[in-house]
Amino acid sequence: MKIEGTVVAMVTPFTEDDVVDEAGLRENINYLIENGVDGLLVAGTTGESATITHEEQRRMIDILVDEVNGRVRTVAGAGSNSSREAMGLVEYAEDAGADAALVITPYYNKPQPHGLIEHYTMLEEAADIPLIIYNVPSRTGTDIDVDTVAELAKLDGIIGIKEASPDLDKVSMLRSRLMDLGLDDFTVLSGNDNLTLPMISMGAEGVISVVANVDPARMSRLVNEALSGDFESAMKTHYELYSLMKVLFIESNPVPVKEALNMMGKARGSCEDAPGTPAGCKP
């Protein structure tokens, strides 16, 4: 199983009554597929995984798998700072038929490397669904190091990492270590739209993208150009998207991307339980 190319970190649309807009979610799924993306993720950071209920999370996984119907890869957000909760979500994603589960490093508790290895090993042993590690130290307070990732990459069920730290040298160190271990099949995905081009040049194989919610065709083009080795064209596409990459993060994600989708007439709704965040998020 490979998860690569442009995977969209989808927003969670809500109705005016602050319930998940299931019809809107299906509309967004089809819009993104029609514009050439390679995969879709629900209930990630952009999907407000930290504030939606587990019931909402499970329902979105069901809708994703049903609506996609094999057309692109499906990735279920299934992380938690509780190993038991994460296990339940991973098992649910497997039963629902998702292609992979994205599992964030446990947040707030700030586990040491041995704790991270224990956490992910337990999840890998609990279910047969491929797992993708999600490293986003700016949100979790934990930055999983290269040695720990390399150790986890030896497990058959852990197939890749979404790397959302800004440290580009870390990508080189990780790729070098994986090559030394003969683990070339382990996938590295960019977790930052603006760093996707340089990360692919260092051996990453795609991106889990926020920007692709708004401009899926052009973000897919950037990734495809870079993966094919056409870095001159990819650089031009990168700079065509650069202003969008920056403006979508002028407020806490997903506030700007939801407002952009609102301006486009796409389903977005308010943000769930996001105090102090304007531009369409409820207080």
Curated annotation (Swiss-Prot):
Extract one GO molecular function annotation from the record.
2-dehydro-3-deoxy-phosphogluconate aldolase activity
Cite the active-site annotation.
Y134 (proton donor/acceptor), K162 (schiff-base intermediate with substrate)
User: Which key words are in the record?
Assistant: Amino-acid biosynthesis, Cytoplasm, Diaminopimelate biosynthesis, Lyase, Lysine biosynthesis, Schiff base
* Pathway assignment: Amino-acid biosynthesis; L-lysine biosynthesis via DAP pathway; (S)-tetrahydrodipicolinate from L-aspartate: step 3/4
Where does the chain bind pyruvate?
A: T46, I208
* One GO location term (cellular component): cytoplasm
**Catalysis performed (reactions):** L-aspartate 4-semialdehyde + pyruvate = (2S,4S)-4-hydroxy-2,3,4,5-tetrahydrodipicolinate + H2O + H(+)
The record's section on SUPFAM superfamilies has: Aldolase
Origin, by domain of life? Archaea
Q: EC number(s) on record? A: 4.3.3.7
InterPro entries, alphabetized: Aldolase_TIM (IPR013785), DapA (IPR005263), DapA-like (IPR002220), Schiff_base-form_aldolases_AS (IPR020625), Schiff_base-form_aldolases_CS (IPR020624)
Q: What's the protein here called?
A: 4-hydroxy-tetrahydrodipicolinate synthase
Organism expressing this protein natively: Methanothermobacter thermautotrophicus (strain ATCC 29096 / DSM 1053 / JCM 10044 / NBRC 100330 / Delta H)
The top of its lineage is:
Archaea, Methanobacteriati, Methanobacteriota, Methanomada group, Methanobacteria
Q: Which gene encodes it?
A: dapA
